Amino acid sequence: MARYTGPHCRQCRREGLKLYLKGDRCYTGKCAIDRRSYAPGQHGQGRKKVSEYGIQLRAKQKARRIYGVLEKPFRNYFEHAERQPGITGENLLRLLERRLDNVVYRLGLGASRVEARQLVRHGHFTVNGKKVNIPSFQVRVGDEIAVREKSKASPRIKELVERAADRTTPAWLEYDGQEAKGRVIALPSRDQIDAPVEEHLIVELYSR
């Protein structure tokens, strides 16, 4: 599956805020946006008027970068969200939140969505007892996400499991630190999604 392979700090600088794509590094003085809080490139420090389309485009790009989704699958998520009953923008966010890599991150079993995606791809997690290595896998209410038994010996996995015990889990998930597993207890409501996304701008962009 295709994925972005460029510098993650450049993405944060482009959006003008921390997207927490590099986990622990984002909380240190090494964070690029703390040192250079302007857009990358030759004209990054210049000011220019942004059009309505430009604002909508930036909202979409920011959402894509937060969740690590390329343009074509992101458009597919939007079209799926349009077909669902309810508010399209909220449906879109709910689909993105239900990605397996995002759920692993939300449970604290990845320091960032980037790391969570990598761990899923390497087969460290099961869903309802079966190994799933597809980051975009859509979890459902009642699904149980767990660290594979053979993966629990990994030093990095051990560290993440220990740290997850002290991390606040979103209300739509529950986490059992003793067993290193979590469960989806509900679909996330809009107020339970803290990603800095202005979904109405994305809807406006795709409705042009």
From Swiss-Prot:
Molecular function in Gene Ontology: rRNA binding; structural constituent of ribosome
Listed InterPro entries: Ribosomal_uS4 (IPR022801), Ribosomal_uS4_bac-type (IPR005709), Ribosomal_uS4_CS (IPR018079), Ribosomal_uS4_N (IPR001912), S4_RNA-bd (IPR002942), S4_RNA-bd_sf (IPR036986)
Claim: Secreted is one of the keywords in the record: no
UniProt keyword annotations, A-Z: Ribonucleoprotein, Ribosomal protein, RNA-binding, rRNA-binding
HAMAP family: Ribosomal_uS4_B (MF_01306_B)
Protein function: One of the primary rRNA binding proteins, it binds directly to 16S rRNA where it nucleates assembly of the body of the 30S subunit. With S5 and S12 plays an important role in translational accuracy.
Protein name: Small ribosomal subunit protein uS4
Organism of origin: Desulforamulus reducens (strain ATCC BAA-1160 / DSM 100696 / MI-1) (Desulfotomaculum reducens)
Upper lineage: Bacteria, Bacillati, Bacillota, Clostridia, Eubacteriales
Gene this chain is encoded by: rpsD
